[in-house]
A protein has these predicted regions:
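Loop/turn-rich, solvent-exposed surfaces of beta-rich toroidal or solenoidal domains
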Residues: 211-215, 219-221, 226-230, 234-297
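Blade-loop segments of beta-propeller domains
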Residues: 63, 67-111, 120-123
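Short loop/turn segments that connect beta-strands within beta-propeller blades
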Residues: 72-76, 113-118, 175-179, 220-225, ...
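A short loop-to-beta-strand structural motif that recurs across blades of beta-propeller domains
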Residues: 67-69, 109-111, 171-173, 215-217, ...
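Beta-rich, blade/repeat-based domains predominating
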Residues: 31, 37-55, 84-103, 109, ...
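Short, conserved, GDST-rich strand-edge loop motifs in beta-rich repeat architectures
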Residues: 3-8, 103, 147-167, 256-283, ...
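Blade/loop signatures of beta-propeller domains
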Residues: 2-31, 340
Length: 340
């Protein structure tokens, strides 16, 4: 459990303007709220708008606890939605309003929850070999499903089950509407978060391997579903790590951001004349959400008491930023909304 007290005065000092262009997205009478806590590693937030008299709600994965959590906007309660979910990680909503999920565990697959609650397996292998551990997922307007497949979920028992990778590379896949699965990106180490630009002419992918592979790559999307023109848009090498992210209507990238354990150290005297190598962070940007414009320039930062793994725009006006962060789910109203 993480104790959190929201700021009692406006504007909230947790919302930082790094560039004047970010000022228009900050609501000066809005502050960061903690909506729920008690998770072990929060991931994969996905929002479902109000429908048929049911209030809007957000689901997120609590991976080590092998469950999905639910925040109900009507009751403002944070509860267990479903257990035994094969260590679900990333989630998204398709164009028909159905939940699509990345599973770890022994299943290592992409599944869709139908309106009647039944499960449909969409992909679990590529070229006859099991996927690694699908991580993050998005749906394009042509109904194709794009997802990343790093090895994090098979590295140990904490977020699934330890297993040997059957794939030669860690890929980004495109699952076409007709069910054909293609590896569209095969040359980056442990792809993680991914998203499209508002016009769907760009695909952004986080490379989240060991240093120095902590960055967001930008690709041009080709009409046939392939990509070209790989460009490094954002470089996060240092003490910070990017995980999941979302793109807003203006093309800004709102990135889950957090301390990754990369420290500089210095020798310091302690009792008895001994030397202790104490850590000194390489960067002041630690836990929260860092916002970049479409050119890769940092423009804003939202400080959180925990590392943010992933985020989602939701609410009736799609201007509530939900942030899945380690043990807790946080939210902040902003003058922006997610690109669809």
């Amino acid at each position: 459990m993480v104790e959190f007290k929201p700021n009692q005065r406006y504007p909230d000092p947790a919302v930082l303007i790094l560039d004047p262009s970010f000022a228009k997205y900050r609501i000066y009478s809005s502050s960061v709220e903690q909506l729920g806590t008690g998770m072990r590693w929060a991931e994969g937030p996905v929002y479902f708008p109000a429908e048929n008299g049911q209030a809007g709600y957000l689901l997120c994965s609590d991976i080590p606890n092998n469950r999905l959590m639910k925040y109900d906007e009507g009751t403002e309660k944070f509860t267990i939605h479903k257990t035994n979910v094969n260590y679900a990680n990333g989630n998204t909503r398709d164009r028909q309003g159905r939940l699509v999920t990345c599973e770890h565990s022994v299943t290592r697959r992409i599944v869709r929850t139908e309106k009647d609650g039944k499960m449909t397996v969409l992909a679990d292998s590529f070229e006859g070999k099991k996927l690694n551990a699908p991580n993050d997922i998005v749906v394009k307007s042509d109904d194709s499903i794009w997802f990343t497949d790093p090895i994090f979920g098979i590295n140990g028992e904490w977020e699934g089950e330890r297993a040997k990778s059957e794939q030669a590379t860690t890929n980004v896949y495109r699952l076409a509407k007709d069910g054909q699965l293609a590896a569209v990106i095969t040359d980056i180490v442990n792809p993680n978060g991914l998203a499209f630009s508002p016009d769907e002419l760009k695909l952004y992918v986080v490379e989240c391997g060991s240093l120095p592979y902590r960055c967001i790559w930008s690709y041009d999307l080709v009409a046939d579903g392939t990509v070209s023109n790989k460009v490094k848009l954002i470089d996060a090498n240092g003490s910070a790590s990017i995980d999941g992210f979302r793109v807003d209507q203006d093309g800004n990238l709102w990135c889950g951001w957090g301390f990754n354990g990369a420290f500089a150290v210095e020798a310091t005297d302690i009792d008895g004349g001994m030397k202790a190598h104490l850590p000194i962070a390489k960067s002041e940007d630690m836990d929260g959400v860092k916002v970049f414009n479409s050119a890769g320039k940092p423009i804003g930062f939202i400080k959180l008491p925990e590392r943010c793994a992933n985020l989602e725009f939701g609410g009736p006006k799609r201007n509530r930023l939900y942030m899945a962060s380690c043990h807790s789910l946080y939210a902040l109203y902003v003058e922006s909304f997610g690109a669809v």
